[in-house]
């Protein structure tokens, strides 16, 4: 599933490249996509529960507007699935715990500002952003429910659905990286970012390290 999503991202980026203009960081628009590598992290929660998140791969798509050679604003969405193991502490029976394994899905719309230090084609940059992450833990929070209906093509169809525990969190990040503008309308960027999630019931806002490799099409 994840490999298929990344393949669609790559094909979409190639298709959009046809309209890219010659290299320039003057005022204008750009479209970008990144592959994200997020490192593992352990998070402690109130009551003694904890979760260990494995390192994983995600993708990011964004639209940017360049005010000038130095300052850019980007708006987009991150998507990732992360495997985790959580230890749940019973709040009634002391010492009773349960361990669950699963994978969560996170979709995070964001807004981010980039500042380029050099006006030339190769420049280091710093970034800062905010977002809101919608997280599905895939932990069931109710019994399975079955519904049936008449489908115009398949006839009488029944399916079983089970709701899962979802949450959301305010996020903020800072980063630094390098951007290289080629002469044919492409730009490449490599960045390191630190992301914080204001998770409900966490002892403190957990932070995650991210490494991003992306391509930008300049218009």
What is each of the regions a protein language model found here?
Residues 37-62, 167-168:
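Surface-exposed strand-loop-strand hairpins of Gram-negative outer-membrane beta-barrel proteins
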Residues 80, 165-171, 181-218:
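Contiguous, function-dense segments enriched for cysteine-driven chemistry
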């Amino acid at each position: 599933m994840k490999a298929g999503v990344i393949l669609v991202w790559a094909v979409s980026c190639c298709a959009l490249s046809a309209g890219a203009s010659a290299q320039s960081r003057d005022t204008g628009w750009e479209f970008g996509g990144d592959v994200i590598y997020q490192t593992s992290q352990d998070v402690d929660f109130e009551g003694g529960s904890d979760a260990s998140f494995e390192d994983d791969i995600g993708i990011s798509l964004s639209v940017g507007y360049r005010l000038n050679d130095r300052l850019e604003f980007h708006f987009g969405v991150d998507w990732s699935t992360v495997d985790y193991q959580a230890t749940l502490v019973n709040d009634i029976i002391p010492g009773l715990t349960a361990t669950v394994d699963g994978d969560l899905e996170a979709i995070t719309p964001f807004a981010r500002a980039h500042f380029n230090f050099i006006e030339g084609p190769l420049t280091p940059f710093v970034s800062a952003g905010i977002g809101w992450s919608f997280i599905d833990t895939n932990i069931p929070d109710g019994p399975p429910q079955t519904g049936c209906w008449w489908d115009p093509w398949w006839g009488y169809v029944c399916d079983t659905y089970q709701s899962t525990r979802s949450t959301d969190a305010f996020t903020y990040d800072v980063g630094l990286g390098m951007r290289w503008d080629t002469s044919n309308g492409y730009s490449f960027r490599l960045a390191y970012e630190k992301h914080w999630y204001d998770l409900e019931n966490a002892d403190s806002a957990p932070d995650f390290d991210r490494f991003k490799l992306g391509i930008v099409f300049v218009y």
